[in-house]
Amino acid sequence: MSFGKAGTMHKWTLDEEQSGEVIRHALDLGINFFDTANGYSEGTSEEYLGRVLKESVARDKVVIASKVYFNPGRLSREAIMREIDGSLKRLGTDYLDLYIIHRFDYETPIEETMEALNV
């Protein structure tokens, strides 16, 4: 299942209303871990999740994970900083509990990527 605007890659995603229903039901069942990514449905997955969580639950009651990749700067420090800022804005929060690289980047030195993730 994926939340977000259906695009050319994933036409099976849930729209905002359906996403909200699923997220609220998950919260009602006690689910508190949500995973998304900067590239899921062109960022709308993060937007939908962020709006529902903001209206439904205190931020410290959920664990939010997001992932980074699929961007022009790959996994450079500059790209990671830009992408996490975008994810935080779309999610409507000032922190993530877990930030993951979506795929390994063979073109950026691993030291640069790891140092950026450790900020």
What are these language model-derived features?
Residues 71-119:
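Glycine/proline-rich, positively charged
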Residues 1-62:
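N-terminal binding-site loop/beta-alpha segment at the start of enzyme catalytic domains
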Residues 32-33, 61-67, 95-98:
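Structural preference for beta-strand elements that scaffold enzyme active sites
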Residues 1, 37-39, 67-71, 101-104:
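Active-site beta-loop-alpha junctions enriched in small/polar residues
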Residues 57, 68, 117:
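P-loop/Walker A phosphate-binding loop and immediately adjacent motor/lid segment at beta-alpha junctions
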